[in-house]
Amino acid sequence: MKKIEAIIKPFKLEEVKTGLAELGIEGMTVTEVKGFPAVIVEQPTSSGLGAPRFMPKLKLELVVRNDLLGSAIAAIKECARTDRKDDGKIFVQDLLEVIRIRTEERGEQAI
């Protein structure tokens, strides 16, 4: 099992959800986050000093079986891409265990 974290532009959420649903991946956690690009864009403040301009983003967290990893990554990349700076990032981690609290199912059965 793998955990995927994807940082995407908010207006791309529905498209990414649809792309993942076509693979049978429907459960995920979505969190509103803010970030700033590698090339920091400064915005004026009341003190006159520039401050990094944080951009609104969404962080998607989902767990997939190993056999769906490549397809899930491809769907996120295809659906979230705008070909502009700051389209986002995808992080993949090995997942040791998943436990569904209600049923106590473990592993892939708990996804």
Regions inferred by a protein language model and the residue ranges of each:
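Positively charged, small/polar-rich N-terminal and surface patches that mediate targeting and assembly
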Residues: 1-111
